[in-house]
Amino acid sequence: MGTGASEKQAEQKVRRAFEASEEAHGTLAASTPWVAMGSAYGSCTCLGAQPVTDLALWPVIYSCMGFSPQAYPAFWAYPWVLYGGYLWMGYPPPAALVPSVWLYWRGASSFDPLIGSPYLAALAPNLFPFPMKFPPTYSLASPTLGGATSSHCPQVGCWTPASSAPRAAVEGPSRGAPYLKTCKAPPSEWASRFGIWAPLPCCSSELRPLPPSPIEDSQLDPGCSRSSSRSPCRARRRLFEC
């Protein structure tokens, strides 16, 4: 009895949100429809293939505690919403190329720039009753672009270890440390508004290995004096370029 009442209340809340959005923003544009998920209290009522593009509707779409891992094997590819003690899920708008985490706290929803497995892994023990495994990184490249980003970074805000040169000069290079190139999401109204940042492993092919050790430098290059054999030959150093 209580399950049916809670599902009915959730459905009414979603319908009211749709009506309010249509009045404020007009007809919703076509986008990927939201999907129904399993819940600890039953199944959420699906409103059909109603498209959702208004970000204001995200916190009031579905109130479900969980989902079926068999039906959603790649659950990390969807945005998650924590709202009123419930976990909600939906497809991202077309402009969003990476997973997003939303928080609901004290009656207001806000975007959290912490994207991907670290944040979801922190929430997982309290939200999911079964073990989960997250991918280490996310690619900002759209599936339709294919390998277009394998040879260069078309995104804005490219960052490499060269941009942290002052820190490297003080601490020295960390031999064997993984150097990942980080790029900002493609320019769009949604992505630029929230400033999404995520690792971009597809650009790792451009990264060059660390220069040889100081001893090898002095042996191979006669221009390096013996007095500088203990310190790297800076003339032979290579900068990591974007």
Swiss-Prot record:
This is Proline-rich protein 23E. Belongs to the PRR23 family. It comes from the Eukaryota. Residues 213-234 are annotated as: Disordered.
